[in-house]
Amino acid sequence: MAHNAVYADMGDMVARFGELEVLQIADRNADGEIDADVVAVALADASAEIDAYLGRFKQPFAETPPILRRLACDIARYRLTATSGVLITDEIRNRYKIDVLELLKALSRGEVQLGLDSAGAQVATSDSGVVFANSKNRIFARDAT
């Protein structure tokens, strides 16, 4: 179900990758400025790619799960680098092909959760925003000695 929300913005890209890198991959008219429209299109495309995997989740989300913000930035970075003439490093390629795609597949299969309640609001989770649960064989308890 499409919802047309974008999970990240240019500020998120700069915070994650630095202004210089974003400039290198998103200055299409070579004026020394980040082309905000180029970044916006890349982030919208990245969000649409994410949504293709998240069909089982109720959308739009009340809040953007932090993990989706990171995934959107990684996808946009990969796509912008591929179209900018800048060399795609192994780190950029692996973040997309291994980290992003594998996590999206795991989310779509229900192997990991976004940490949202039934209304789509964020619940307390780990820093990544992804919840891993295992109820078997508890090792530690409050009363353990």
Please provide the spans of the model-predicted regions:
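Conserved short "hinge" loops at termini or chain/domain junctions
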Residues: 1-68, 126-145
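Short loop/turn elements at secondary-structure junctions
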Residues: 78-145
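Core structural elements
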Residues: 67-78
